[in-house]
């Protein structure tokens, strides 16, 4: 059997933005289908705005890449993502794709939704909320301090999503003696060693 030829697409682009220190900003996102392979490289030119006093600290710019499957973002109890795509065994599956109604929300420049493709000032009726769910899942798993911060709420239901946060998050500082200091000695209850009777 002869293999089908795979097509190649050049998706290169320029992303110009300004950001505050510590913000977790999505700079790109792709929807990947089964058997898709994506090869990417990133180059960055970083400039600082004029400051009243120079920064006396090391500044690291980190660009991380993640793959988040839809099955982690959309867990349906009575149906599956496959049923949504195929229509189920009878072809009549009516599962609604997760969305957020943005008609009552105003998007501003520099918001998470701005970085995820919703232009500032635009108010589309429905927005594919899976991108914001993926962002929040990545923040929960990789960037939050589990001792000091509460997890972001992520809905995994179909239809209208009213609980998934759509605000830009900040990352935690690198681990050192100061940032890992806690007001308690250990997690959980204290150990009481059995002493002789």
Question: Model segments located where?
Answer:
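Intrinsically disordered, low-complexity segments
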Residues: 1-197
